[in-house]
From Swiss-Prot:
Similarity section: Belongs to the YbaB/EbfC family.
Residue ranges of the TM segments: none
Keywords assigned: Cytoplasm, DNA-binding
Protein known as: Nucleoid-associated protein lmo2703
Tree of life domain: Bacteria
Length: 105
């Protein structure tokens, strides 16, 4: 019967961890991230849900003769903000799986 108490304790611990993970995920999703490129000439903002909320382009980088450069800057700023979200998510959620030997995590 000792094993049942252990199992109940483990289940409670898992439920607590699930609640903490859900809160951490909600906090991440509500957070706003900012990516930049060209020394701040292009800024892209996104939520933790990876929804782009704002793009700011400094007029100095708008050259009708070189649209490709502007496209590259927007792409770089977007990739920067997405990487920040990914890194923050991995760091935050990694705390929950640290020490667990779960395949695929």
């Amino acid at each position: 019967m000792r094993g049942m108490g252990n199992m109940q304790g483990m289940m409670k611990q898992m439920q607590k961890m699930q609640k903490e993970m859900a809160k951490a995920q909600a906090d991440l999703e509500a957070q706003e991230f900012t990516g930049t490129a060209g020394g701040g000439m292009v800024t892209v903002k996104a939520t933790g849900k990876r929804v782009i909320t704002d793009v700011v382009i400094n007029e100095e980088v708008v050259d009708p003769e070189d649209i490709e450069m502007l496209q590259d800057l927007v792409l770089a700023a977007t990739n920067d903000v997405l990487k920040q979200i990914e890194d923050t998510t991995s760091q935050t959620m990694g705390k929950f799986t640290q020490g667990l030997n779960i395949p695929g995590m």
